[in-house]
Amino acid sequence: MTYLLLALAIVTEVTATLLLKASNGWEKWEYGSASIFFYSLSGIIFAAVLKNMGVGVAYAIWSGMGIALITAASVVFWKQTFDMYAIVGIMLIVSGTIIITSKSAVVFQ
C-alpha cells in the first residue's frame, strides 16, 4: 500500500508540474490554480507515505521518478530535446531509484 500511495504522490506532483508549465507563467491562471491543488494533494499523500517509509528513501524515489516522468512528458507535449549528458544523467537517477527500491534495507525504517 505504501508504494501505491507513493506512486499516487508522484503522479499528482508530475501533474502539478505539467499544469504549471501549461499555465505559461500564470498567463493561463486556470492551469496555475489547478497546479496548486495537485501540489497540495501530492504533499498530503506524500505525508501518508512517510508514516511507513524513511524520508530519505521516499524522497529519492519521489524526486527520481518525478524527474523521469516529467522529462518524458516534456518530450511528448512540448517536443523538448535532450543531449547525451542529460539522457545519461536521467538514466543514472532512474538507476539509483531502482537500486534503492530493490536492494536497500532502509526503505521502511
Give the role of each language-model region.
Residues 1-109:
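Polytopic alpha-helical membrane proteins, predominantly small-molecule transporters/carriers
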